[in-house]
A protein has these predicted regions:
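N-terminal nicking endonuclease/strand-transfer module with a His-rich metal-binding environment
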Residues: 1-240
Length: 240
């Protein structure tokens, strides 16, 4: 068994403004009721914390996503089905994360994560970053609004007229989630985590690090359960 301690950086597109995930991440429902998932230790939930200071008037992760979009100076209307938020899980192998916490370096670790997020995606685009301490392994749930600048990249078609495109801010998850960029994120994140004893997995390897893979599966299962429960509550309210 390998003793290598891996850095974990997992990106996923949210659905719309990703409000369904806010329940799990913020430990509360849209109407403010406390929600503790089955895999969380409610005795430790008070240790969870939001690391980003929201703008005045913004009270939640979901509102922070919309605030960024409304104030980004976008030239084009945001499509109904466009991805407005990218969710990012940041952590490391359980054994090393426990060492980081027990050695009093967790705050330094969170600071390094925030720096990497802001350097990588732009400070204004990092609208939320919640530290979870009530599950098995300490981890961060970061939320990035994929606003980019520069001309939109697309292949020209033969015979197609060329139009001048605006180069201002635009919402584009495709730009942020391109395959080449995803590989770069893994490299730069591992470099930022090196001082904490965490390193990147083997580039190009088809093998999955078991503990990391299990972590992802547990997270996705919990998300699905949260969404199903919230949908049931909405249907019940509509029936009433």
């Amino acid at each position: 068994m390998s003793n290598i301690q891996h850095a974990v950086c997992h990106l996923q597109r949210g659905s719309g403004n990703d409000s369904g995930m806010s329940c799990h991440i913020e430990r509360k429902t849209a109407d403010g009721k406390v929600y503790i998932p089955d895999n969380a230790n409610k005795a430790r939930t008070h240790l969870n914390r939001e690391l980003i200071t929201f703008p005045d008037g913004v009270r939640s992760r979901t509102e922070a996503v919309q605030y960024r979009i409304d104030n980004a100076g976008l030239h084009r209307k945001v499509g109904k089905n466009q991805t407005k938020a990218i969710r990012i899980i940041l952590t490391g192998s359980h054994e090393q994360m426990m060492k980081i916490e027990q050695s009093g370096k967790l705050d330094k670790w969170t600071d390094a994560n925030l720096k990497w997020l802001r350097d990588t995606f732009g400070e204004d685009n990092v609208v939320s970053c919640v530290l979870h301490m009530d599950e098995k392994t300490p981890h961060l749930h970061a939320t990035v609004v994929p606003i980019v600048t520069g001309e939109r990249k697309r292949k020209s078609r033969e015979g197609e007229k060329k139009y001048r495109t605006q180069t201002g801010p635009r919402l584009s998850a495709d730009d942020v989630m391109g395959r080449g960029r995803l590989s770069t994120y893994q490299n730069t994140y591992a470099e930022a985590m090196r001082e904490f004893g965490l390193q990147r997995g083997v580039v190009g390897s088809t093998a999955k690090h078991q503990s990391n893979g299990e972590f992802y599966r547990q997270q996705m299962l919990q998300y699905e359960n949260d969404i199903a429960r919230l949908n049931a509550e909405v249907e019940k309210a509509n029936e009433g």
